[in-house]
Curated annotation (Swiss-Prot):
Organism: Campylobacter hominis (strain ATCC BAA-381 / DSM 21671 / CCUG 45161 / LMG 19568 / NCTC 13146 / CH001A)
Pfam families, per the entry: Ribosomal_S8 (PF00410)
Protein name (record): Small ribosomal subunit protein uS8
Keywords, alphabetical: Ribonucleoprotein, Ribosomal protein, RNA-binding, rRNA-binding
Subunit comment: Part of the 30S ribosomal subunit. Contacts proteins S5 and S12.
Top-level taxon of origin: Bacteria
Family: Belongs to the universal ribosomal protein uS8 family.
């Protein structure tokens, strides 16, 4: 059984991006869906939609590339892991890659980007970084 759906999803996106695939399919969870919502808002992926096959839910992710075929995602890294959780307060959440990257944080108010968490005045578990 798979324990960390976020890591699995990020790895599937990273692998599909390196192979220049148009889409990839992830296992569904609410947290993964929240992370994908942020990735879509920030322009790292084209879109995503929910699908159901054999009474199992999946998320189909449409990846985004520029006109030269380069992926919008340069690097996507899981920070907090099941064996070592990483938490940051609102003051510790910093800009990533001088504002070119995005930190995704799970807070008491839901999953949001690091900038949104700082503005909301909440800290939380740092899920991943993307640039």
């Amino acid at each position: 059984m798979l324990n960390d759906l976020i890591s699995d999803g990020l790895t599937r996106i990273r692998n599909a991006s390196m192979r220049r695939l148009d889409t990839t399919k992830l296992l569904h969870s609410n947290v993964v869906e929240s992370v994908l919502k942020i990735l879509a808002e920030k322009g790292y992926i084209e879109s995503y939609n929910l699908i159901e096959e054999d009474n199992k839910k999946f998320i189909n992710v449409v990846l985004k590339y520029n006109e030269h075929g380069k992926s919008a995602i340069n690097e996507i890294t899981k920070i907090s892991k099941p064996g070592r959780r990483i938490y940051q307060t609102k003051d510790e959440i910093k800009r990533f890659k001088n504002g070119y990257g995005t930190v995704i944080v799970s807070t008491s108010k839901g999953v949001m980007s690091g900038i949104e968490a700082s503005k909301a005045g909440v800290g939380g578990e740092v899920l991943c970084t993307v640039w």
